Amino acid sequence: MSHVDTLLAEGLAAIAAVQDLNELEQVKARYLGKTGQITELLKQLGKLPPEEKKAAGATINVAKQQFEAAHNARRDALNAARLEAQLAAEALDVTLPGRGAGVGGLHPVTLTLERIASLFRSMGFEVADGPEIEDDFHNFQALNIPADHPARAMQDTFYVEGGNVLRTHTSPIQVRHMLANQPPIKIIAPGRVYRVDSDATHSPMFHQMEGLWVDDGVSFADLKATLTDFLRRFFERDDLQVRFRPSFFPFTEPSAEIDVLGKNGWLEVGGCGMVHPNVLRNVNIDPERYTGFAFGIGLDRFAMLRYGVTDLRLFFENDLSFLKQFN
């Protein structure tokens, strides 16, 4: 049966030479498949004389068992090698530093508020604060807003229990500060305010900053100089053109709208004026002795201008992919 020994030797050599499982299965099929060489030897046993069949069958079965044992051993070795390679590729280096936690950032409106507050602090203004739910006196009466003024209408103001309102401006902060302090007064009052309005450039909740300067001899010239300097520093343009258009506000007289000249023409950025004498009287400040100016700007609008955002609602939809670009 030298032929069987030769065939087994060739099969074992073929098994030892394979480098992947697919190739190993092909070798197995070549020897033990339906038409495999060892399988064919088993099929030919029936043609042998009875006296030779038993010995030949035993020899072929031994060869088959040796082939299967070699095949199984090689298969296990290839599987082990594949697993080792996979583990090596996915190995963790425990000496490497860990991944840092994600770092948050400030909201673009907050960044704008801090920038504006910093500019006014450099001009001697202090930051004042107050409640967001106000009574009628602080939100309307003290500011010379009569009972029949349109600003008191339900379509413009959020009314809450007890006749109170969600403040429609940060002017009540100024009222509270003037009631608690005598001139000189030089403050800015940033904060959230509320009005019944909602579209691409308006929100029912938005951020406003108002300013107030009350002292001996404060004039409209001081108002223009202060706001012109602020706007040029905020927009980082020393040649920025600023104009003041006559307007009307019940709490200032005279009053003006503030415009800046942009690429597409004049753009309104706020309102201002000299504090109305009635407002000074309402907070126990003598208008015969003191004068002052006040102004108001929309922080959200300034954030839109600074960052080139055209839809105000994007700031408050909590879309991190949008907000992260400002960090």
UniProtKB/Swiss-Prot annotation:
Binds 2 magnesium ions per tetramer. It is found in: Cytoplasm. Mg(2+) binds at E253. It catalyses: tRNA(Phe) + L-phenylalanine + ATP = L-phenylalanyl-tRNA(Phe) + AMP + diphosphate + H(+). InterPro entries: aa-tRNA-synth_II, aa-tRNA-synth_II/BPL/LPL, Phe-tRNA-synth_IIc_asu, Phe-tRNA_ligase_II_N, Phe_tRNA_ligase_alpha1_bac, Phenylalanyl-tRNA_Synthase, tRNA-bd_arm. Its EC number is 6.1.1.20. It comes from the Bacteria. One of its GO terms (molecular function) is tRNA binding. Keywords: Aminoacyl-tRNA synthetase, ATP-binding, Cytoplasm, Ligase, Magnesium, Metal-binding, Nucleotide-binding, Protein biosynthesis. GO terms for cellular component: cytoplasm. The keyword Cytoplasm applies. Its cofactor is Mg(2+). The keyword Ribosomal protein does not apply. Its main location: cytoplasm. Tetramer of two alpha and two beta subunits. Belongs to the class-II aminoacyl-tRNA synthetase family. Phe-tRNA synthetase alpha subunit type 1 subfamily. This is Phenylalanine--tRNA ligase alpha subunit. It comes from Laribacter hongkongensis (strain HLHK9). The lineage of its organism: Bacteria, Pseudomonadati, Pseudomonadota, Betaproteobacteria, Neisseriales.
